[in-house]
């Protein structure tokens, strides 16, 4: 990505780049963090997408949940899956995000994960110690299988005529196999291993204080009030019960505007 350090590495002074931006609103400082995104549906990048979704739909849901998950949260997760599985089958709903950063590096991000982690207090005083966060990535195997196929999709993208002219190469330890026709063989071996090993957060947390009925593990009601409290609302991405097939920012703005309307009407 383009940063002060990378600009200096290219023998362009930071002061000159800053002056170019302040004077003309041009130059390397106009480069965004992410320059290009796409949200392909399952059928657009996974040849065996029907088989993958069917297998996930039939799998024991407790595998995807943290040990000791309360019965209400389990019930809420089951309700989410009844909604989420059809979304994965929908040809107009993004299952992953393909994103290119400011220097053209392609990566992928899961948009419809079936795995569930946990966020628990580590102290009676919330300001004393940070919470215990366990994302439990790919506790539902479906997620990493999808990511592995999405990585192969990136390989196909860089072999298109338009991209090939730029002579892109895979960054180690990732690779692009010579033959992309047998997705299952490749993704169930080395590519799947890489997806599991290097999986990391995209720093877009959501869902920790879900808007759901209390008996489905919800934390806030439809007016964003925390159950069992007075005068306490949550107004952020935490109220989203499921990850969106999109970036969160616009949705958070909408939640905030709705919260303002609710509060001003009181």
Question: Across the structure, where does each feature detected by a protein language model lie?
Answer:
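Mid-to-C-terminal "cap/lid" subdomains and adjacent gly/pro-rich loops that border
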Residues: 1-100, 163, 167-169, 175-189, ...
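C-terminal structured subdomain/cap of oxidoreductase catalytic cores
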Residues: 1, 105-163, 190-266
């Amino acid at each position: 990505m383009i940063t002060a350090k990378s600009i200096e590495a290219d023998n362009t002074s930071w002061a000159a780049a800053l002056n170019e931006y302040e004077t003309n609103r041009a130059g390397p400082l106009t480069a965004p963090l992410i320059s290009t995104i796409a949200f392909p549906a399952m059928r657009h990048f996974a040849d065996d997408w029907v088989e993958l979704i069917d297998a996930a739909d039939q799998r024991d849901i407790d595998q995807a949940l943290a040990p000791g998950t309360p019965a209400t949260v389990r019930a809420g997760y089951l309700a989410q899956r009844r909604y989420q599985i059809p979304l994965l089958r929908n040809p107009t709903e993004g299952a992953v995000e393909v994103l290119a950063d400011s220097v053209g590096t392609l990566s992928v991000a899961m948009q419809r994960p079936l795995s569930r982690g946990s966020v628990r207090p580590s102290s009676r005083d919330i300001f004393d110690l940070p919470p215990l966060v366990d994302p439990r990535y790919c506790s539902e195997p479906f997620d990493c299988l999808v990511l592995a196929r999405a990585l192969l999709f990136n390989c196909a993208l860089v072999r298109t005529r338009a991209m090939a002219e730029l002579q892109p190469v895979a960054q180690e330890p990732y690779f692009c196999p010579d033959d992309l026709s047998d997705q299952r063989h490749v993704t169930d071996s080395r590519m799947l291993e890489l997806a599991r090993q290097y999986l990391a957060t995209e720093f877009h947390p959501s869902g920790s204080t879900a808007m759901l009925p209390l008996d489905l593990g919800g934390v806030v009601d439809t007016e964003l009030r925390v159950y069992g409290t007075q005068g306490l609302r949550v107004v952020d991405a935490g109220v989203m019960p499921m990850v969106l097939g999109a970036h969160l920012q616009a949705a958070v703005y909408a939640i905030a505007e709705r919260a303002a309307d609710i509060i001003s009407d009181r």
